């Protein structure tokens, strides 16, 4: 009997997505606004600081004030992703990959939203009646890489305290406006070496959940490996409150799964697309924490 002729081939009946950031992690940390029918949009009209005038005489003339105003602008970026599943390929696999491809494309679009938020956090923003004024990220809102140390260091408690001080000094309402600090795995590991973070002697309740620092000094920590570095290759970590940044959504993540009748084999196309943009709303609500790695 020729037993080898009975050998069988067994193929995987499941599909596994490889390691990746699964969608957006920052979308919920900023303001969100739906936008329609515009190549650029104004998420909010702003009124600046005014001060009361003390009266020193009776019946003085009323002098109108000149209240400062501003108008931030937000511009859209278009993103998409697609792939095809050939009908002849589906005949040769146990598991149809269509839904897994749709999930992978949705994850990619979520990461694109995070990249847009991070990019526009530090980028020049447009303000004014028609967006003709350019406002750069202010140096006064940057925490130096060597802050509180004799040399260049990573993320430290001292830097987090300084970020909080800058926000409080600008009258940011940290009691009602959620504060976020974005870190990579390296900055998170820096904090695990800080005794003030990990010791219960300094904290009324644990700040770690299953080995992850989730909140410290009033900041919710969000992890992503999408953070950029500056020209000196130091990591740029945003520390901000929710009202300081807006994600404008012209078209939220949309998935279309349809048959391509213009291609041989009538393959299934998985198409994911979206249009969105982001901008800072107020520089005093944003801080850049520069960290060595």
What are these model-derived regions, one by one?
Residues 61, 118-122, 287:
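Flexible domain-boundary/linker segments
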Residues 130-205:
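Extended, solvent-exposed, turn-rich assembly/linker loops in the middle of proteins
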Residues 44, 68-133, 171-185, 221, ...:
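Long, contiguous amphipathic alpha-helices that act as assembly "spine/axial" helices in icosahedral shell
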Residues 2-29, 33-53, 60, 67-75, ...:
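Sequence/fold signature of self-assembling virion shell proteins
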Residues 9, 13, 95-99, 158-161, ...:
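Generic alpha-helical secondary structure signal
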């Amino acid at each position: 009997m020729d037993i080898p002729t009975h050998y069988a081939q067994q193929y995987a009946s499941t599909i596994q997505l490889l390691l990746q950031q699964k969608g957006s992690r920052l979308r919920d940390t900023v303001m969100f606004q739906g936008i329609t029918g515009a190549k650029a949009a104004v998420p909010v009209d702003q009124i600046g600081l005014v001060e009361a005038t003390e009266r020193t005489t009776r019946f003085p003339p009323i002098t109108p004030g000149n209240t400062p105003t501003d108008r931030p602008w937000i511009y859209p970026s278009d993103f998409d992703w697609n792939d095809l599943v050939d009908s002849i390929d589906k005949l040769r696999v146990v598991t149809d990959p269509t839904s897994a491809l749709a999930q992978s494309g949705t994850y990619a679009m979520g990461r694109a939203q995070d990249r847009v938020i991070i990019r526009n956090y530090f980028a020049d923003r447009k303000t004014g009646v028609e967006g003709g004024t350019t406002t750069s990220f202010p140096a006064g809102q940057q925490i130096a890489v060597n802050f509180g140390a004799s040399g260049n260091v990573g993320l430290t408690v001292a830097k987090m305290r300084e970020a909080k001080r800058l926000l409080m000094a600008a009258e940011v309402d940290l009691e009602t406006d959620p504060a976020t600090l974005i870190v990579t795995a390296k900055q998170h590991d820096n904090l695990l070496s800080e005794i003030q973070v990990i010791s219960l002697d300094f904290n009324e309740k644990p700040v770690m959940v299953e080995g992850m620092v989730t909140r410290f000094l009033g900041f919710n920590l969000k992890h992503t490996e999408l953070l950029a570095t500056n020209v000196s290759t130091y990591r740029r970590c945003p520390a901000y409150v929710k009202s300081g940044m807006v994600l404008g959504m012209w078209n939220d993540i949309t998935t279309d799964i349809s048959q391509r009748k213009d291609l041989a084999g009538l393959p299934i196309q998985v198409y994911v697309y979206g249009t969105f943009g982001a901008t800072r709303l107020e520089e005093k609500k944003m801080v850049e924490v520069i960290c060595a790695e």
